[in-house]
Amino acid sequence: MVHSLPLDYPRPAEKVHVGAQQHYQLSEQLLGQLHQVARAHDCTLFMLVHGALSLVLSRHSYSQDIVVGTPVANRTQQELEPLIGFFVNTLVLRANTQHENLRSYLQHIRQVSLDAQANQDVPFEQLVEHCQVQRSSSHTPLFQIMLSMNTTSASSLSLPDVSITPLAGEGYQCKFDLELTLDETTSGLGLTWGYDTGLFNAERIVQLQGHLAELLSALARTVEQPDMPLRALEMLSTEER
C-alpha cells in the first residue's frame, strides 16, 4: 500500500533517502489540554496525535484508509529488561477515518494501537512476507510515513570536567517519505518533520504542520464535547477558510 498524499515532485524509480527537517513547538498550555482530552477518552498522548495526524493525512489525500508506522522497544519479556542490545521492531498502524464522532474515532485509534502493541513481537520482515507485498525500490513496503515519540530527553550530559551536548549532523537521511517525531518536554510538545526532498518541498511541510497544529488546537477544545462530529474538527487556518 502506498499513500495517496499529493507529491510536489514525481516519485523516482529508486528512493535516494535525501531529506530535510523542520522543527516546531506547541505550547505547554496546549500540551496540558491535549493530555486532558486524551485522559477523557482513555488514550495516550501518542494515540491522540496519531488520530489527529491520520485525519490531516486523510483530508490531504482524500483517502479514509491511512497507514503509518511506529517503532516499538519490543522488550515485553522481563528477562530482556536488563540486557544491552537493539530489540526495536516496527509496528504498522492502519486507521480508518470514516467515523461519525470524535469518541468513536478515538476508540478506534486506541484499539488499533493496542492491537499492534499486542503483536509487537512479530518481526516486521515476517509481516511483509506474510502480506505478500510487491516490493519496489521507489518506496518502503506497507507504509511510507513514520510517527514516533521520544521517551528520553536529548538534553546535555554532564561528567566530571566534561560537558556533552547533542549536535545535529549536516544533511539528513530520510528513510521514509515523511517522518514525524514527537518530543514531550517541560516547555511543551516538540514536533520534528523529516521529509524526502525528492518528493515534497518545504512549503508542503509548512502546510501539513499548520493543519496539524490547527487540528490539535481544535481537539484541545473538545473536553466538554467528547461526541463532537468528526467533520466539525477544523484544520484550516482563518486565512484559508
What are these language model-derived features?
Residues 1:
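C-terminal reverse transcriptase regions that engage the nucleic-acid substrate
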Residues 6-12, 19-206, 217-222, 232-235:
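Adenylate-forming
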Residues 208-211:
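Short conserved active-site loop signatures built around small residues
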Residues 227-241:
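Short, highly charged C-terminal tails/helix-capping segments
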